[in-house]
A protein has these predicted regions:
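Acidic, glycine-rich two-metal-ion catalytic cores of nucleic acid-processing enzymes
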Residues: 191, 204-314
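N-terminal leader/targeting and assembly helices and adjacent pre-domain segments
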Residues: 1-203, 301-314
């Protein structure tokens, strides 16, 4: 592993560690949100085990929003603030490269770029908060109008937040949920997920806050990493990039074909625009690399730093 690869690996290690913490805290936040939303729903009066007071159902909307702000939006705020750690390692990596000292510090322009990127990412998390607030409030109101059994309403609310990973009464189900959230053994995880799906078959695929927030937590972090790396590289006049990262079972053909290769910006953009593959995003290679949920990184480099054999000489 040469110096450029080492710098890319350091970034990858940090980003992976930050993402793991973000997802762990998200799981906790949504578990607490689910618990509080159920508790709030239980404050509504029932008649024959059904909600019946439409006015009270409507009045619950701001209370639901307050709970989402308390648990989820607070999590999102802390998540986006931690992007500063990614920005720091990107700047620290630049200090190792043979470039002008002018580009080895955090400039006022960098701070403005970081602030704007964080604002955009936070807005994405807020969109999920708004969508979930509306979905939960609408479910309570519609259940009141239709006379839906209250226990079914509660279950729908839980699933809208956490999908199949709702807090269940059965100890076995809760143990499976905990196992999926914590195990690093993919075989064990898949068996647990399959068992959960057997119990909650209708929710195998569905819209829920956990699913979208988890995906956005990954994509936003990786997008920030890629976008700020590109900005710092452009600032320093670096227009070549090493496509870096591991290959795993579901790696896309684009990533498998390009991993370990060095491309100019134009070459990379040409490849991106001329090729199609499953999971390709609508952004660009510096934002998404191989597409949605991609874990690869682009590390700035320069052809003059290598000899005719392709060995790094800096």
């Amino acid at each position: 592993m040469d110096k450029i690869e080492e710098l890319a690996q350091l970034r990858e290690n940090l980003v992976d560690d930050i993402e793991a913490r973000h997802i762990n805290r998200l799981n906790i936040a949504l578990e607490n949100l689910e618990k509080d939303v159920v508790k709030l729903a239980n404050t509504l009066p029932l008649r024959e085990n059904k909600l019946f007071e439409a006015r009270l159902a409507v009045e619950l909307r701001p209370k639901i929003k307050a709970l989402i702000d308390k648990h989820y939006v607070l999590w999102a705020d802390g998540t986006v603030r931690e992007y500063d750690k990614v920005a720091k390692i990107i700047v620290d990596n630049m200090k190792i490269l043979p470039i002008s000292e002018n580009f080895k510090t955090l400039t006022e322009l960098d701070i403005e770029t970081i602030t704007n990127l964080k604002r955009v990412k936070f807005t994405g998390f807020l969109d999920i908060a708004t969508e979930t607030t509306n979905a939960l409030a609408d479910e309570i109101y519609q259940s009141t109008i239709s006379g839906k059994p209250f226990e079914d309403t509660v279950k729908t609310l839980q699933h809208r937040i956490n999908g199949v990973y709702i807090k269940a009464d059965q100890d076995e189900i809760n143990d499976l949920v905990e196992l999926v959230a914590t195990t690093t053994d993919e075989t064990v995880k898949q068996k647990a997920i399959d068992k959960l799906h057997t119990v909650y078959g209708a929710d195998r695929v569905g819209n829920n806050m956990r699913r979208y927030a988890k995906q956005l937590a990954h994509d936003s972090l990786m997008e920030f990493d890629g976008q700020f790396t590109k900005a710092k590289a452009a600032e320093a006049g670096l227009t070549n990039f090493l496509y870096y990262g591991d290959i795993i079972g579901d790696s896309r053909p684009f990533c498998i074909a390009n991993r370990g290769k060095i491309f100019s910006e134009d070459e990379l953009r040409d490849k991106w625009s001329s090729e199609s593959w499953k999971g390709k995003s609508t952004t660009d290679p510096f934002t998404s690399r191989g597409g949605y949920n991609c874990r690869h990184h682009l590390q700035p480099t320069d052809p003059s730093w290598y000899n005719e054999n392709g060995d790094l000489i800096i």
